[in-house]
Amino acid sequence: MTDFYIPPKEISFRLLGYVSQYVLVSRTHNDPQVFHHPKDSENPDQYFQLIPGTGQHAGYYLIKSKYTGKVLFSRLSPSPRVGHIDGSGQYGDNWFQVEVGKGQYTQNFRLRNFASDTVLFSRTHANPQVYNHPASDSNPDQYFTFLFEDMKVDKVEYHLNLGKILSSIPIIIANQTLQNDSSIDQEMAFELDVTETHTSTFEYTTGFTITYGATFKAGVPLVAEAEFKVDTSLSQEWKFGTMTEFGKSYVAKLPVKAPPHTTVRAVSSVNRGDIEVPFTIYLSSKATGFQVQTHGIFRGVSTWDLRHTVSTQDLK
């Protein structure tokens, strides 16, 4: 179960239409002044902030443009029904609820107005393209999502004390034999150099929503001597929300001696299983340095606990 993240007023964002794939703009140099634009052409007039309300407007927000300083409104009359205005929310039609969707829209929301009980929409197939509609009628073009400003990952903290081994089975990674048919001792070194493939992913649960596929670097949680530790030597580039593969190498050298007419066998094995470790990712705005947190679960298929069994058997 995940909670929908509503950003604090210090974090800016673009509002992306679910159907249009355009982002809203607030401008004064062209009409209509509140309109939309293709998301791939990024401009300062596309960024907004949410200012939370109090009192009768608790649970509602001003949608304030970082570019013009104006706040959006949605009303039934007069024209224009959708636009922006100076001020700090003195009118009821300046306040919006972030109404989270259901089903296929669980990662999206409608912007529902306090006074007019209308919702904004963004479409390209008909005019008007950016307008409002009664909230009682739900349509796909009424849904939006946040595209947040550029953030950087400051650190990844694994909560190792809460890590879990969900499954574990032993696997053999090497099986070596020295057979001595002679009448004198024979010595050699069994050498192990094996790389096991690990897979893992970072799954979001709460907090700031990192863009799917966003890249960052972090160490790898692993099991060592029945405890979880972080291996910084395996610092890996991850893509958030996607499966990542990386290798863990096992290297060892075992001197063995085989007495006359014996066989010496060395078996090297590890445990392989599923693990999960809760994490917190600390991020900050590249523009302002304001810090936010993302919480989730690191899930992976891992190996651990390298061990060797050496046995001697007489030849018959």
What kind of feature is each model-predicted range?
Residues 1-155:
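Lectin-like carbohydrate-binding module/patch detector with strong preference for beta-trefoil
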